A protein has these predicted regions:
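Short beta-strand segments enriched in small/hydrophobic residues
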Residues: 138-157, 267-268
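Periplasmic-binding protein-like
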Residues: 194-207, 225-228, 265-270, 316-329, ...
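Segments of small-molecule ligand-sensing domains
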Residues: 391-457
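Beta-alpha junction/loop-to-helix N-cap segments that form part of ligand/metal-binding clefts
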Residues: 156-161, 174-233
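An alpha-beta-alpha
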Residues: 165, 243-298
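Alpha-helical protein-protein interaction scaffolds
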Residues: 1-129
Length: 458
């Protein structure tokens, strides 16, 4: 209806300013019905009626965002309809899509595009997201500093991560200098690394040491830093990325999974503690983006509390996301089998333990949980080796996988930081980075089916 009223307007009676607003409304209407190409065409018309430089630049960024969100088949099947402006946009997004896995070629393709379309609005106001790619330099490491707790209370954590890092390094000739953060203060380690000419640092792992870097970013100026943890104080710092096995990542993955599974009114049951608050908040932030509303976050002290969360809830409350131990999850499943048998249960990796028995899984039919994709590879020689060296302890195996992925990430540091949408397939998940260079992990989902754990589609 709104579009019909727009089309009925006599554009000859509108000023350029009014026309720009007209086409912006038209673009938003097309975007709402998921018609990306029509939205882009409307924004091209909008640009023709804009004089303010900032509004033109914002419009370019919005147009680029639309194209980036589009299915590649839609882009590839679109016609420029004889429009140089539309043709330029389509050529630009195709150059991006075709070269996303080869950032050096992508940089060259963008330069070529600017030469081919010198008068295009996107050449004048190059999309902000692509600016850093014009002068992209592939990651090229001379040596690496690895910062881990290798003695004291954190020794088992540090040595397990180091084992994964070293195995991923394999025969690489890049020298690695190891620093023990249990015996040397982080600021001294950074000074020693700089004195040794180290330009890339993996670590630290402990949160207080990550906070020390955040509090004094000038100390690591000129270095690429991949921390192995994130904290509440995490902020965007040039050449610093944050990576870790955060339960918040799992919560975001759960929100995505439940939304894709058609669940629209989930109950999110979190333990009544700091972990529960952080994870519940992470789920809610992602749910707001997906659904436009807050998720129903509830906090429990005892597993039995969860049955009360379903009293008076909408009939379509078909899903529960819960962070719990294996024993707590078994209790929750038992209660819901009696009171709400149709509720689909989604859980975090906290419930997935090596100590879970066949008898345990026999009671957990239908439960889905997120964990690292490495656990899909149980028949591989690498998995068998790691299971042997860690005693099959899942938490240590996750840390090993994290160490392996730390090697992968530091060797693709520039790509991760500078290439929008760049992803890496790691042992801990599909890895990508947001605008703050927080490394996101898209988890693998598993389901208990007839007593067996099988990987399912995300």
């Amino acid at each position: 209806m709104a579009e019909g009223k727009l089309r009925a307007l006599d554009l000859t009676k509108l000023s350029p300013s009014q026309k720009s607003r007209y086409y912006e409304t038209f673009a938003q209407t097309a975007e709402n019905r998921k018609d990306v190409i029509e939205a882009v065409k409307a924004r091209i018309k909008m640009d023709e009626n804009l004089t303010d430089m900032q509004r033109r630049k914002d419009n370019v960024d919005k147009t680029w965002s639309l194209l980036r969100s589009a299915n590649t088949a839609v882009i590839n099947n679109a016609s420029d309809e004889g429009s140089v402006a539309l043709g330029g946009w389509l050529t630009l997004i195709k150059a991006y899509n075709d070269n996303i896995r080869q950032p050096v070629q992508l940089s060259q393709a963008l330069q070529s595009w600017k030469s081919a379309y010198p008068n295009h609005v996107a050449a004048t106001f190059f999309p902000k997201e692509l600016e850093s790619l014009l002068n992209f330099q592939q990651t090229n490491l001379a040596q690496i500093g690895l910062v881990l707790p290798l003695s004291g209370d954190g020794q088992i954590l540090g040595t397990t991560i180091q084992s994964g890092f070293n195995d991923a390094k394999g025969d690489s000739t890049i020298p690695v200098q190891v620093f023990d953060s249990s015996t040397t203060p982080i600021n001294d380690i950074i000074a020693q690394a700089k004195a040794s000419g180290i330009k890339a640092l993996v670590g630290p792992l402990l949160k207080q040491n990550v906070d020390a870097i955040i509090a004094n970013p000038s100390a690591v100026q000129g270095m690429d830093v991949l921390t192995l943890n994130a904290t509440a104080n995490t902020q965007a710092i040039n050449q610093v990325c944050y990576y870790g096995l955060s339960p918040e990542d799992e919560a975001e993955s759960a929100a995505n999974k439940m939304w894709k599974d058609g669940i629209r009114n989930p109950i999110v049951a979190m333990p009544q503690n700091d972990l529960g608050q952080r994870v519940g908040n992470a789920f809610n932030v992602r749910w707001q983006r997906l659904a436009g509303t807050d998720a129903n976050i509830r906090y429990y002290n005892l597993p039995a509390d969860i049955t009360y969360f379903f009293q008076g809830t909408p009939q379509d409350t078909a899903g529960l996301y819960v962070v719990s131990s294996p024993d707590e999850l078994a209790e929750i499943k038992g209660y819901l089998d009696t009171s709400n048998p149709n509720v689909r249960i989604y859980a975090s990796s906290r419930s997935n333990a090596a100590s879970n028995t066949p008898e345990y899984y026999a009671k957990m039919n239908g439960v889905q949980f997120s964990d690292i994709p490495f656990f899909k590879q149980s028949d591989s020689s690498q998995y068998q080796k790691v299971a042997g060296s860690t005693g099959g302890e899942f938490q240590l195996m996750r840390l090993y996988a994290m160490g392996s992925d730390a090697w992968l990430l530091i060797n693709h540091f520039n790509e991760l930081r500078q290439v929008p949408g760049y992803t890496l397939s790691g042992l801990t998940g599909q890895l990508s980075a947001d605008s703050n260079c927080d490394v996101d992990r898209d988890m693998t989902w598993y389901q208990v089916q007839d007593g067996n754990v099988v990987a399912v589609a995300n």
